[in-house]
Curated annotation (Swiss-Prot):
It comes from Bacillus velezensis (strain DSM 23117 / BGSC 10A6 / LMG 26770 / FZB42). Binds 2 divalent ions per subunit. This is S-adenosylmethionine synthase. Catalyzes the formation of S-adenosylmethionine (AdoMet) from methionine and ATP. The overall synthetic reaction is composed of two sequential steps, AdoMet formation and the subsequent tripolyphosphate hydrolysis which occurs prior to release of AdoMet from the enzyme. Belongs to the AdoMet synthase family. The lineage of its organism: Bacteria, Bacillati, Bacillota, Bacilli, Bacillales. Mg(2+) binds at residue 19.
């Protein structure tokens, strides 16, 4: 590798990873609530360990959800259906500890500071303040057709394929837990030129040999996913490098909602504000504003206004308007960053109520995001992945 080139690595995990089990359970409960109560306030946390699921958090809703039933159905869909896998949907214990949302928080969310002070009319604002303070990032680049960085895009596709070959009985000896990792080499112009390394670790039946796993995964997982032109004789493969991965899932490691925030976003390629997504309704700006920031960044790149774009939004609890908007195009912008911020303010309503309305976020759409990434998805229709504002942004920014 020449001195002007660099390597960058991102990872993903399968739906059977302990932390991802928790994300999916939390979002399954959220979706079940939103089906009958779109205005519910939900902050649902899940933890799993050997034979045990604990669901806790704050939920304010007018509907009823059978949480243990939802938990078991989710675990079953993932594939933990037999005790010998280390976790079983039918026999695991499910404990719940749910409270209502704090009245102090609800006061700020129900009526934004601007509405309480009379500085914005009822016609201007839906009177929803941010559910917490915080900063959120969104990112897009033109490395892939999904406008995502290549390392995380390939890592997700490998993880999804790992699950597909298990569920479709192509490789029936695989079990639900697994991880993937891709290292991409970039040239002096910051363009991806080759894959330097691929790492896959997958849980498996105890009687299968490492050689068979390595041969099968290369044929059925790596080759169908990774573009042939990015592979060369120096590409390194690490498939189950420990040699054995029989004990997995919650039996191998405890899991917790919100512990895979880099997998959920951009694989470390862009910055992260620290807030997790799963189990939170759209009044929580950790989730909704991160989706809005991706929506903004993707439309800027889709408009041809930048090759790479990172958007930061920041909020104060109980205040509707973002306290700051920042845009970084990494010297690839066709317009100044000040101009882009002006154009974004004119075309996107980034108040919590505005985001909810703009992206139609009071729907049960969240479980499908809880594994294989919240961004760059081609298999599901997610509103923040649309590029419907690209033309308007380009015309206003460039004066066309």
């Amino acid at each position: 590798m020449s001195k002007n080139r660099r390597l960058f690595t991102s990872e993903s995990v399968t739906e059977g990873h302990p932390d991802k089990i928790c994300d999916q359970i939390s979002d399954s409960i959220l979706d079940e609530i939103l089906k009958n109560d779109p205005n519910a306030r939900v902050a649902c946390e899940t933890s799993v360990t050997t034979g045990l699921v604990l669901v806790s958090g704050e939920i304010t809703t007018s509907t009823y959800v059978d949480i243990p039933k939802t938990v078991r159905e989710t675990i079953k869909e993932i594939g933990y259906t037999r005790a010998k896998y280390g976790f079983d949907a039918e026999t695991c214990a499910v404990l719940t500890s749910i409270d209502e949302q704090s009245a102090d928080i609800a006061m700020g969310v129900d009526q934004a500071l601007e509405a309480r002070e009379g500085t914005m009319s009822d016609a201007e604002i839906e009177a929803i303040g941010a559910g917490d303070q915080g900063l959120m990032f969104g990112y897009a680049c033109n490395e892939t057709k999904e406008l995502m960085p290549l390392p995380i895009s390939l890592a997700h596709k490998l993880a999804r394929r790992l699950s597909e070959v298990r569920k479709e009985d192509i490789l029936p000896y695989l079990r639900p837990d697994g991880k993937t990792q891709v290292t991409v080499e970039y040239d002096e112009n910051n363009k991806p030129v080759r894959i330097d390394a691929i790492v896959i670790s997958t849980q498996h039946h105890p009687e299968i040999t490492l050689e068979q796993i390595q041969r099968n995964l290369k044929e059925h997982v790596i080759n169908p996913v990774v573009p042939e032109e990015l592979i060369d004789e120096e590409t390194k493969y690490f498939i189950n490098p420990t040699g054995r991965f029989v004990i997995g899932g919650p039996q191998g490691d405890a899991g917790l909602t919100g512990r895979k925030i880099i997998v959920d976003t951009y694989g470390g390629y862009a910055r992260h504000g620290g807030g997790a997504f799963s189990g939170k309704d759209a009044t929580k700006v950790d989730r909704s504003a991160a989706y809005a920031a991706r929506y903004v960044a993707k439309n800027i790149v889709a408009a041809g206004l930048a090759d790479s774009c990172e958007v930061q939004l920041a909020y104060a609890i109980g205040v509707a308007q973002p306290v700051s908007i920042s845009i970084n195009t990494f010297d690839t912008g066709k317009a100044s960053e000040e101009k882009l911020i002006e154009v974004v303010r004119n075309n996107f309503d980034l108040r919590p109520a505005g985001i909810i309305k703009m992206l139609d976020l009071r729907r049960p759409i969240y479980k499908q995001t809880a594994a294989y990434g919240h961004f760059g998805r081609h298999d599901v229709d997610l509103p923040w992945e649309r590029t419907d504002k690209a033309d308007a942004l380009r015309k206003e920014a460039l004066g066309e």
